[in-house]
A protein has these predicted regions:
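Catalytic domains of carbohydrate-active enzymes, especially glycoside hydrolases
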Residues: 76-102, 207-210, 312
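Glycine-rich, aromatic-flanked loop segments that form ligand/cofactor-binding clefts
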Residues: 39, 47-52, 90-101, 130-177, ...
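Aromatic-lined carbohydrate-binding/catalytic grooves of carbohydrate-active enzymes
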Residues: 88-125
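Polysaccharide-binding and catalytic clefts of secreted carbohydrate-active enzymes
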Residues: 90, 169-311, 320-321
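Substrate-binding cleft of secreted/luminal carbohydrate-active enzymes
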Residues: 300-304, 308-326, 343-426
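Active-site clefts of carbohydrate-active enzymes
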Residues: 56-57, 271-291, 319, 333, ...
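Active-site-adjacent "subsite" loops/lids of carbohydrate-active enzymes
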Residues: 48, 56, 60-76, 147, ...
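The substrate-binding groove and active-site-proximal loops of carbohydrate-active enzymes
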Residues: 61-72, 112-128, 180-194, 239-250, ...
Length: 427
C-alpha cells in the first residue's frame, strides 16, 4: 500500500508525502476534532464485525520470513500466521499473492515469486502450492482468505534481465514503463490491463478464495511523463487531457475485474484499498477537509466513483493517521468515507495503521499505545463502518504494542472471533 506496503527507502519517502507530514504539522492537533461516545449496542455491533489483517509478502515483510525455506518451514510459518489471526479475533487474512508481477501459486500467466525460493520463476520446495495451503488452512480455522495482488508493479529496482523469462514484462516489453528505478505495467495499454484481469480470474477459477483484493498502486505518481506516447496512441482522440484519460484507464480496469471475476464466482468479494484521502476539499468540491496526498489526482484512482457505481464490493481506505491530526484527521476521514458509502451496498472497512504504534515514534500521538484503541472506539460509534483491516501481520507477534493493546480491547468489549459465532466466519 502506498503508505506502508514496502519499507524500502523510496517508499518510506512516499509515506511522508502521502501523509503530508512536515516536522511542525506531524503533531498538530485539531481541538475541534469530532468525538463520539459509543453505546453498549455500538460495542456489541462492533464485536461481531469483519476484521482482517494484511499479510505482506513483498520483501518478506510478513511471510515467508526469508527466502529458500523448505515446504515444511513454509507450512509452519503459514500455520503460525493463521493461528495468530484466530487469537486476535480476526475473521479474514489478506495474503499478498502477487507482490511484483509474480505469483505465490502455480500460474500460467505469472512466474513463481522470488520472495519464496530466492529466484523468480523457481518453484518452492516440493512444488508447494502456497496459496492452496493458505486457503485450506484459513478455512479449516473458520477464517476468510482474500488473495491480494499488486496489479501493475513489476520491480522495485534491479534490471529486467533479472526477472524470469515468463514474466509479463519480459514477454511484452512494450507493456511497461520505467519510472525512477521501478518498472510498471502501463495501465494505458488495453492488453496490459486485460492481462492483470485474467490473472485475477485465474485465481478465482482455481482457488476457493473468499475475495480478491488490490491495494493503492495504480499510476506511480502524478508527475510522470513515461506514458505520453501511450496517451497519443490510445487517449488523445477521446480525452482533452491526460489526467482524465489515466483515471478512465483505472476505472475500466476496476469495472472489468468486477465483471469478470463475478462471472466465475458471483459471491467472491472484490475489494480495493486506496490511499486514505480521495481528494482534499481545496482541490475538489466533493473532497474531505484534509491537506494530504490525493489518490484522485496523484494515483488517478477515482474511488468515490467506484463506490457510487458499485463496481467494487468493499473499500478499505488506508486511514493511517491519528485522531486530531490537523492535515489528515482520522475521525474526519472516517466520517467522509462513511458518507460516501452511505446509500450503497459497498462494505466500508477502515484500513488501520497498527504498525505505527511505537513507544519510540517521532509522532507523539503514536507513542501513546492506545491510539488504535481510540480509533476503534470512534469506529464503534460510526454506524456506516462495517469493520477494519490492520496493517500488517508482523505487528501482532508476541510483544508487539498493537498485539497487547488490541487484545485488551477485544477482551474488554467481548469481540467475537471465528470460534465465537462471528457471522463473518466461514464455519
Amino acid at each position: 500500500m502506498t503508505q506502508t506496503k514496502l519499507f524500502s527507502t523510496g517508499l518510506l519517502l512516499l509515506v511522508a508525502i502521502l501523509a503530508g507530514f512536515t516536522a511542525s504539522s506531524a503533531n498538530a492537533q485539531d481541538a475541534s476534532a469530532p468525538l463520539k461516545t459509543p453505546t453498549a449496542a455500538d460495542y456489541e455491533r462492533q464485536a461481531a464485525q469483519f476484521r482482517g489483517v494484511w499479510v505482506s509478502t513483498v520483501s518478506n515483510i510478513d511471510f515467508p520470513s526469508k527466502r529458500g525455506l523448505t515446504a515444511d518451514e513454509l507450512k509452519a510459518e503459514a500455520d503460525a500466521q493463521l493461528d495468530r489471526a484466530v487469537e486476535m479475533k480476526f475473521t479474514a487474512v489478506f495474503l499478498q499473492v502477487r507482490p511484483m508481477g509474480d505469483a505465490f501459486y502455480p500460474s500460467k500467466l505469472y512466474p513463481w515469486s522470488g520472495f519464496i525460493s530466492g529466484k523468480q520463476g523457481q518453484a518452492p520446495d516440493q512444488n508447494l502450492d502456497v496459496l492452496q495451503y493458505w486457503v485450506e488452512g484459513a478455512h479449516k480455522r473458520g477464517l476468510q482468505i482474500h488473495a491480494w495482488i499488486n496489479p501493475y508493479r513489476v520491480t522495485i529496482g534491479g534490471k529486467l534481465e533479472d526477472l524470469a523469462e515468463n514474466n509479463p514484462a519480459r514477454l511484452h516489453p512494450d507493456w511497461i514503463f520505467k519510472h525512477g528505478e521501478r518498472y510498471f505495467l502501463n495501465p494505458g495499454i488495453p492488453e496490459a490491463r486485460e492481462h492483470v484481469v485474467k490473472g485475477l480470474v485465474e485465481i478465482v477459477t482455481n482457488y476457493d478464495v473468499d475475495g480478491v483484493h488490490i491495494d493503492d498502486y495504480f499510476y506511480p505518481e502524478r508527475n510522470i511523463t513515461e506514458d505520453l506516447e501511450t496517451y497519443e496512441k490510445y487517449g488523445k482522440a477521446d480525452f482533452d487531457n491526460i489526467e482524465d484519460w489515466r483515471r478512465d484507464n483505472v476505472n475500466k480496469f476496476v469495472a472489468d475485474v468486477n465483471r469478470e471475476v463475478h462471472k466465475v464466482r458471483p459471491n467472491v468479494v472484490w475489494s480495493v484499498s486506496p490511499a486514505g484521502i480521495w481528494a482534499n476539499k481545496g482541490s475538489h468540491p466533493d473532497g474531505s477537509e484534509t491537506r494530504g496526498n490525493q489518490c484522485y489526482f496523484n494515483l488517478y484512482a477515482d474511488v468515490r466513483k467506484w463506490i457510487k457505481e458499485e463496481t467494487i464490493d468493499a473499500v478499505i481506505p488506508q486511514i493511517y493517521w491519528h485522531i486530531g491530526l490537523e492535515i489528515a484527521n482520522f475521525s474526519i476521514l472516517t466520517d467522509w468515507w462513511s458518507d460516501v458509502c452511505e446509500g450503497t451496498d459497498v462494505k466500508f472497512y477502515v484500513g488501520v495503521a497498527a504498525y505505527r504504534l511505537d513507544p519510540n515514534s517521532k509522532t507523539e500521538a503514536w507513542r501513546d499505545l492506545q491510539e488504535v484503541n481510540r480509533q476503534l472506539v470512534y469506529m464503534a460509534a460510526s454506524p456506516r463502518v462495517d469493520g477494519q483491516v490492520f496493517f500488517t501481520a508482523k505487528n501482532f507477534k508476541e510483544g508487539q504494542p498493537a498485539r497487547n493493546t488490541m487484545l485488551e480491547y477485544a477482551k474488554e468489549h467481548n469481540w467475537k472471533g471465528v470460534n465465537d459465532g462471528n457471522p463473518n466466519s466461514v464455519k
